[in-house]
Swiss-Prot record:
Membrane-crossing segments per the record: none
Record's cofactor remark: Binds 1 Mg(2+) ion per subunit.
Protein name according to UniProt: Dermonecrotic toxin LsaSicTox-alphaIB2ii
Compartments where located: Secreted
Main localization category: secreted
Keyword field contains rRNA processing: no
Cofactor: Mg(2+)
Disulfide bonds: 45-51, 47-190
Family of the protein in this entry: Belongs to the arthropod phospholipase D family. Class II subfamily.
Enzyme Commission numbers on file: 4.6.1.-
Lineage, top ranks: Eukaryota, Metazoa, Ecdysozoa, Arthropoda, Chelicerata
Catalytic residue positions: 5, 41 (nucleophile)
Catalytic reaction annotation: an N-(acyl)-sphingosylphosphocholine = an N-(acyl)-sphingosyl-1,3-cyclic phosphate + choline; an N-(acyl)-sphingosylphosphoethanolamine = an N-(acyl)-sphingosyl-1,3-cyclic phosphate + ethanolamine; a 1-acyl-sn-glycero-3-phosphocholine = a 1-acyl-sn-glycero-2,3-cyclic phosphate + choline; a 1-acyl-sn-glycero-3-phosphoethanolamine = a 1-acyl-sn-glycero-2,3-cyclic phosphate + ethanolamine
Tissue/organ expression: Expressed by the venom gland.
Length: 276
């Protein structure tokens, strides 16, 4: 999965997919009542990027629905996965459940079209704080309560705080999650990737590939350089988040990687661990 980073303005959906992304990451900020409000990152953000692009969340969802609904004039067949980077650090821990519920209601109405030929992309909810695990509970209960239990098949989870992998496992246990797990690892592109290294990403990959691991997919962020792309591919991650999708696409075309990796399509289940 080539994951376009910080796609917060509607026009950027086309821009990133046209550069080679089959997945996008979108920031979601919340108001004081735990309602998702804007697709907005704010300052600071990655180097060489404008941090302040935004839309109202529901307007973005409607545009995203069009981009992922077959037959729509804005449809992109290859856009198959969307990561919502949930900026929940502005919320109190006790608001996490409500935030999940309200997020699900917004998606149900504006993205899934109340279960009537809505957008088809798989969704990853990326949560920065392990203590906000109840967001998952609130989110999962909502489609079920609204008569659309099938939509839970479209949703997976990620804790994005670079926490200890064992602690992440405990948070999922509390949330009752037993699958659909993506694990992110990384650092802003402003800091050279060699300073962080890939040790934790490799630890996540080892968990993914072990018989008793809880992780299904691993992605590394934010990668804009060819050398770092190669290192991440050598570590056998499933996804790379980038500001420059064309760079990742170029490296995937190199002879060393062409035979081993391919771009994921809608038929590739993002919740299944890839078996070599």
């Amino acid at each position: 999965w080539i994951m376009g980073h910080m796609v917060n303005a509607i026009y950027q959906i086309d821009e990133f997919v046209n550069l080679g992304a089959n997945s996008i990451e979108t920031d979601v900020s919340f108001d004081d009542s735990a309602n998702p409000e804007y697709t907005y990152h704010g300052v600071p953000c990655d180097c060489r990027r404008w941090c302040k692009k935004w839309e109202y969340f529901n307007n973005f969802l409607k545009a995203l629905r069009k981009a992922t609904t077959p037959g729509d004039s804005k449809y992109h067949e290859k856009l198959v996965l969307v990561v919502f980077d949930l900026k929940t650090n502005s919320l109190y821990d006790h608001q996490a459940y409500d935030a999940g519920k309200k997020l699900a209601k917004n998606l149900l109405q504006h993205y899934w079209n109340n279960g009537n030929n809505g957008g088809r992309a798989y969704i990853v909810l990326s949560i920065p704080n392990l203590s906000h695990y109840k967001l998952i509970t609130g989110f999962k209960e909502t489609p079920k309560n609204e008569g659309h239990p099938e939509l839970k098949e479209k949703v997976g989870f990620d804790f994005s705080g670079n926490d200890n992998i064992d602690q992440v496992a405990k948070a999922y246990k509390k949330a009752g999650v037993t699958g659909h797990v993506w694990q992110s690892d990384g650092i802003t592109n402003c800091i050279a990737s060699f300073i962080r290294g890939l040790d934790r990403a490799k630890e996540a990959v080892a968990n993914r590939d072990s018989s008793n691991g809880f992780i299904n997919k691993v992605y590394y962020w934010t990668v804009d350089k060819r050398a770092t792309t190669r290192e991440a591919l050598d570590a056998e991650v499933d996804g790379i988040m980038t500001n420059d999708p064309d760079v990742i696409a170029d490296v995937l075309n190199e002879s060393a990687y062409k035979a081993k990796f391919r771009i994921a399509t809608y038929d590739d289940n993002p919740w299944e661990t890839f078996k070599k």
